[in-house]
């Protein structure tokens, strides 16, 4: 996803409020844990993209930020929502540097849920874990990991170790954890 961002100068409440009134989202770009720049993202463009995004996939979505003539690859590290309207009011981006490890949550996509044997026998599919914490290089980031639940019967479970994890991605979460189960109703 490509975003055109503008620079902003101050952290004063009045300026940030004005940015939001003009249809912008105040954001901070970090690199190596340190603040690199205060920026503004177009709220309409970001919200439209967010509405098309699969649930949980924002954490593993790589953005290309066009900032002052440069193309910067970044991940959303934090997002803040308005309490009542649920509008995005602030973003934190982390710059991706080639060769430097990045920690992120990659969502798990459960496939063949309709064809699951246990569900056909009257069971209920319960997703225990929705994402897995990993460490990898920016070039190895994938949007999601898949886990096939078609052969899962009643009262059976699949663990994180059953997920085919691509080379270059090292899980931080214990692979002994239960990812999904089919429970009797």
UniProtKB/Swiss-Prot annotation:
SUPFAM superfamilies: Ribosomal protein L25-like (SSF50715)
Domain of life: Bacteria
One of the GO BP terms on file: translation
InterPro entries, per the entry: Rbsml_bL25/Gln-tRNA_synth_N, Ribosomal_bL25/Gln-tRNA_synth, Ribosomal_bL25_b-dom, Ribosomal_bL25_C, Ribosomal_bL25_long, Ribosomal_L25_dom, Ribosomal_uL5_bac-type
Keyword rRNA-binding: yes
UniProt keywords, alphabetically: Ribonucleoprotein, Ribosomal protein, RNA-binding, rRNA-binding
Record has rRNA-binding as a keyword: yes
GO MF terms, alphabetically ordered: 5S rRNA binding; structural constituent of ribosome
GO (cellular component) term, any one: cytosolic large ribosomal subunit
Quaternary structure note: Part of the 50S ribosomal subunit; part of the 5S rRNA/L5/L18/L25 subcomplex. Contacts the 5S rRNA. Binds to the 5S rRNA independently of L5 and L18.
Family recorded in the similarity comment: Belongs to the bacterial ribosomal protein bL25 family. CTC subfamily.
Alphabetized PANTHER family for the sequence: RIBOSOMAL PROTEIN L25/GLN-TRNA SYNTHETASE, ANTI-CODON-BINDING DOMAIN-CONTAINING PROTEIN, RIBOSOMAL PROTEIN L25_GLN-TRNA SYNTHETASE, ANTI-CODON-BINDING DOMAIN-CONTAINING PROTEIN
Biological role: This is one of the proteins that binds to the 5S RNA in the ribosome where it forms part of the central protuberance.
Designated name of the protein: Large ribosomal subunit protein bL25
């Amino acid at each position: 996803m490509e975003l055109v961002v503008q620079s902003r100068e101050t952290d004063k409440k009045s300026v940030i409020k004005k940015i939001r009134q003009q249809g912008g989202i105040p954001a901070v770009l970090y690199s190596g844990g340190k603040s690199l720049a205060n920026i503004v993202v177009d709220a309409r463009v970001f919200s439209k993209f967010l509405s098309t995004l699969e649930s949980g996939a924002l954490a593993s979505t790589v953005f290309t930020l066009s900032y002052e003539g440069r193309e910067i690859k970044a991940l959303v590290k934090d997002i803040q929502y308005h309490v009542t309207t649920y509008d995005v009011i602030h973003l934190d981006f982390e710059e991706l540097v080639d060769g430097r490890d990045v920690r992120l949550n990659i969502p798990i996509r459960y496939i063949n849920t309709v064809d699951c044997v246990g569900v056909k026998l009257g069971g209920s599919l319960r997703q225990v874990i929705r994402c897995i914490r990993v460490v990898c290089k920016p070039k190895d980031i994938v949007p999601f990991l898949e886990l096939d639940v078609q052969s899962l019967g009643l009262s059976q479970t699949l663990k994180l170790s059953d997920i085919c994890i691509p080379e270059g991605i090292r899980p931080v979460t214990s692979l002994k954890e239960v990812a999904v189960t089919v429970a009797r109703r």
